[in-house]
Regions:
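Hydrophobic alpha/beta core scaffold segments
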Residues: 2-408
Length: 408
């Protein structure tokens, strides 16, 4: 299943505690900037200063005399994070956007551990970052972002999109994504919840020289290139008619389905006893919610002692849900990328947020190498997440991405 959002021509307001945008390229009649130019580098070194130094050396060897205009990075949460933040902020004077990850995606496909970094060069892509802290203050933060963007009109032919990075342990993504989408309107965005290899211990985001918990950073990119936001998931519905008759969205609990304990109904639909509802089985059969013509995924984390289903995104009382069966993940990606490329051409860069559960399923299916190779061939730079955002939605077990065209 694939959903897309094409770039939008008119732009609306955005935010407050902010870092970055370089000056506008010329006045209101400025011509579009050159095509996007970037380099992806990776270090497995465990010492943060050495890791950053090695990446800076590699970038210098590829682009002697050039400094990046923007940097996006994803890192292992086991680094001493303040030391890493210090090394990054000392080495790079441009806007920085990053967080801890459950693994990275880049030219080498999927990677675990270490530090991955995307350096963007030239004036074809600009980045400004906006802090939302704490996550619960989403609405007031979005108002500040909106005012900041309204004060910065775009040159003709330029557009904006967003990349949201949010602490994956504070369960505020639904409210945050909704606030951003409705508060900014014409800024399509994707996002990912910071991860830590499923340890669920510490998943901070980076802003202005340090890593911050219970926070989010909204990166606003400006470009004259065509782009498209899209998402891909590979689950097909079983055609079960299930009604959520009791839920606790704040705690992401589904308590009853069709008036019975949720675990009982779920297991019955799968034709198995409740006792065998293992993490692997739950991951293979998430809940599916229909929104218009699209299906969105709600991953199930575990069955509680009270026989409720603890989900990784909120589910409301009264909604109709189905149960998904896993289809072919690689083929779903191929269809998604084919559709996007038919509209904007071959991308110069794809920023991607891919659920850690998708990677785990690929490992179990012996497909990790093939899927990683596919993403590398399609110039994806991104990370494995605790959850994904797509415009106003917080979802699970999905690949969300922004593809930037090689041509304007």
């Amino acid at each position: 299943m694939t959903a897309t959002t094409r770039e939008r021509r008119s732009q609306s307001p955005a935010r407050g505690a902010a870092a970055g945008f370089p000056s506008q390229p010329g006045g209101p009649d400025a011509t579009p900037a050159p095509a996007i130019s970037n380099e992806c580098v990776f270090s497995a070194l465990g010492d943060p200063a050495q890791a950053v130094q090695s990446l800076a050396r590699e970038l210098h060897s590829r682009r002697p005399g050039q400094a990046p205009a923007a940097v996006v990075f994803f890192c292992d949460g086991l680094y001493p994070l303040q030391a890493l933040a210090d090394a990054l902020s000392q080495r790079f004077s441009c806007p920085l956007l990053g967080c801890t990850s459950g693994g990275q995606i880049g030219p080498g496909g999927f990677r675990r551990g270490g530090l991955s970094l995307l350096a963007c060069y030239g004036s074809g892509l600009r980045l400004g970052t906006h802090l939302i802290e704490p996550v619960s203050q989403a609405e007031s933060a979005v108002e500040r972002i909106a005012r900041a963007l309204a004060d910065r009109p775009l040159a003709p032919g330029w557009r904006r999109f967003g990349l949201l990075l949010v602490d994956g342990l504070h369960q505020g993504e639904e409210r945050l994504a909704h606030a951003l989408y409705h508060g900014l309107g014409d800024v399509p965005f994707i996002g990912g919840s910071a991860s830590d290899e499923m340890r669920f211990e510490h998943t901070p985001v980076y802003f202005d020289g340090r890593f911050r918990s219970n926070a989010a950073v909204f990166g606003v990119f400006e470009t004259s290139q065509a782009f498209e936001a899209f998402r891909v998931q590979h689950f097909v519905p079983r055609r079960e008619r299930l009604v959520i008759t009791e839920a606790d969205p704040e705690r992401r609990l589904v308590i009853q389905i069709n008036g019975l304990p949720a675990a009982e109904v779920y297991a019955g639909a799968l034709g198995v006893p409740e006792a065998v509802l293992s993490p692997e089985l739950l991951e293979a059969h998430p809940l599916l919610l229909r929104m218009g013509d699209e299906l969105v995924v709600r991953a199930i984390s575990r069955v509680t002692r009270a026989r409720a289903l603890l989900c990784m995104s909120a589910v409301e009382t009264g909604v109709l849900v189905d149960i998904g069966d896993a289809g072919a993940a690689l083929e779903a990606l191929q269809r998604g990328f084919d559709a996007v490329e038919s509209r904007i051409g071959e991308p110069a860069l794809v920023l991607g947020c891919d659920c850690t559960l998708r990677r785990r399923q690929a490992e179990r299916d012996n497909q990790l190498g093939a899927i990683g190779d596919f993403l590398a061939r399609h110039r994806v730079f991104g990370f494995s997440t605790h959850g994904e955002q797509f415009n106003g939605l917080h979802i699970n077990q999905t690949f969300t991405a922004i593809a930037l065209a090689a041509q304007p």
